[in-house]
């Protein structure tokens, strides 16, 4: 396909505890299986973003392009603004997540420089939502936001 960017609806449990209960495993298990816990964390973040952004008619989708770059979530607002978002449990994954988001932004800029029509809007925000304690803006402009900072 010649399509540069694909976006679609993000599907998840309305409550991530359903996935935990359905697995039949105790919560302590997930402390030893961080990959599975990461999926549950992502589900929790999307649920919260969906709830908090609904006040502003925000819509949630995902991003995947022909270069196999992905963003865990795209938050779209009615005014056309959007944020590319990655979800990472720990601080050790923030650098890689930020690099992915910056690469997507670079590709959008590159696409627009070629004079393609229609041009693509660059992301208004690049965000990594984490399970860490502190919120900050990195020197490259990526915002790192703990899930505990999300509010309606």
Where are the regions that the model predicts?
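Mg2+/Mn2+-dependent nuclease catalytic core
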Residues: 90-111
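Hydrophobic/aromatic beta-strand patches that form the interior of the parallel beta-sheet core
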Residues: 12, 61, 83-85, 127-129, ...
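Accessory nucleic acid-recognition modules appended to NTPase machines
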Residues: 1-81
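Short mixed-charge
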Residues: 106-125
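Active-site ExK catalytic segment of metal-dependent nucleases
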Residues: 76, 83-92
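Domain-level recognition of nuclease-like catalytic cores that cleave nucleotide substrates
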Residues: 129-152
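Switch/connector loops and helix/strand junctions flanking conserved nucleotide-binding motifs
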Residues: 21, 94-96, 135-139
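Conserved nucleotide-binding/hydrolysis micro-motifs of P-loop NTPases
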Residues: 18, 67, 91, 133-135
């Amino acid at each position: 396909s010649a399509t540069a960017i694909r976006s679609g609806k993000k599907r998840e449990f309305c409550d991530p505890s359903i996935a935990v209960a359905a697995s039949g495993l105790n919560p302590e298990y997930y402390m030893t299986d961080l990959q599975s816990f990461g999926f549950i964390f992502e589900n929790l973040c999307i649920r919260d973003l969906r709830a908090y952004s609904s006040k502003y008619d925000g819509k949630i989708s995902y991003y995947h392009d022909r270069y196999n770059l992905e963003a865990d979530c795209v938050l779209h607002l009615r005014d056309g603004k959007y944020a590319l978002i990655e979800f990472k449990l720990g601080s050790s994954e923030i650098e890689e997540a930020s690099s992915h988001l910056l690469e997507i932004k670079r590709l959008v800029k590159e696409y627009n420089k070629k004079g393609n029509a229609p041009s693509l809007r660059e992301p208004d925000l690049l965000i990594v939502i984490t399970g860490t304690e502190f919120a900050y803006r990195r020197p490259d402009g990526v915002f790192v936001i703990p899930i505990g900072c999300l509010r309606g």
